[in-house]
């Protein structure tokens, strides 16, 4: 899964993800994307409380 552009050849220096992939390795980067709509939490809680 990619979040952004693949990158250019100048980014393939040793120690980078691109270098690892180019040399047949798997590169795993732990990423956490928080897409919670915090601005909607109060309205959602009020809606749930009505149930």
UniProtKB/Swiss-Prot annotation:
Its cofactor is a divalent metal cation. Gene3D superfamilies: Survival protein SurE-like phosphatase/nucleotidase. InterPro entries: SurE-like_sf. Its EC number is 3.1.3.5. The keyword Hydrolase applies. One of its GO terms (molecular function) is nucleotide binding. Binds 1 divalent metal cation per subunit. GO terms for cellular component: cytoplasm. Keywords: Cytoplasm, Hydrolase, Metal-binding, Nucleotide-binding. It catalyses: a ribonucleoside 5'-phosphate + H2O = a ribonucleoside + phosphate. It is found in: Cytoplasm. Nucleotidase that shows phosphatase activity on nucleoside 5'-monophosphates. This is 5'-nucleotidase SurE. It comes from Histophilus somni.
